[in-house]
Amino acid sequence: MHRCHPVRLARPVRPIRALMATLALSGALAGALCGAPPAAAQTLEKSTVRHGNVEVPVEIARPVGRGPWPAVLYIHAKRGYEDVDREHVRALARDGFLVMAPDWLAANMIERWPDRHVPESEGDVEAALVALRAHADACRQPVGVVAKSRGPYFAVRLAAKRPQDIGPIVSYYGHFQNPNAPEPQQLFSVAPEVSQIRSPVLMLIGDADFELRRMVNGRAFYLLWERGVPVELQMYPMARRAFDFRADQSPEEKMAARHATERERAWLRRWMALDAQGHCTGAAPR
């Protein structure tokens, strides 16, 4: 990393005015040589939304500047809502999205890594969707969804139930079957909602992920494609489950994570019909 040195003028100049000129020139040149200071970290606002008698914890990240902004619902995996999720939420906000992330485990005091699906948690995520749609700084259009592992199951359930509210879905190694379904259904079919939704779906998964998860992604991909729903499946070579944040990331997984971030941004912008600056236009997606 290069060091920045003070800039000296070639010859002395008159006091006061000269000093001001020197400071201005030095500041300009130092900025050019060193680059602008890094932007402050995106802050997260903690809040709650109500689902029946339950207060659902949510975190909200906003882009810099004034809204309205395109809105994204972030749905975490069954491992829980953690710092890696917070960084993903901040990154989405830096890309220009107003993001709300409900903690669907905490709302019902569910332990991390639950061995079954708790249907009540779907209402918690839906309550966050309703709050996000009504947010004063959200564009008045369907929201995008970024979801991980168990999260895409929530997403397709919501997209089938509230098609007017759900726009494009970005799925990271997603589960496209009811986790409580019998084993034969886990192996040979997908959730019935996959046959109903119209939301464009981008699937991001590694080719070294678990075989069952790769199979259910493949089945969901073919079913959506056959129905004419916009869908793409990005399979990353040599990438394992949680390739985008795992502590022992290989060089290939680090590149896959960067590529996935670019694909995520492009998918959301395309199917939310945003302009080149990432602003809402009100146009129909193409």
Regions found by a protein language model. Give the residues of each.
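Bacterial N-terminal signal peptides
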Residues: 17-35
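Serine-hydrolase catalytic machinery in alpha/beta-hydrolase-like enzymes
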Residues: 44-62, 68-135, 242-248
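Primarily recognizes the serine-hydrolase "nucleophile elbow" in alpha/beta-hydrolase
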Residues: 127-196
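Short beta-strand/loop motif that positions the catalytic acidic residue
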Residues: 197, 203-205
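Acidic catalytic loop of the alpha/beta-hydrolase fold
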Residues: 208-212
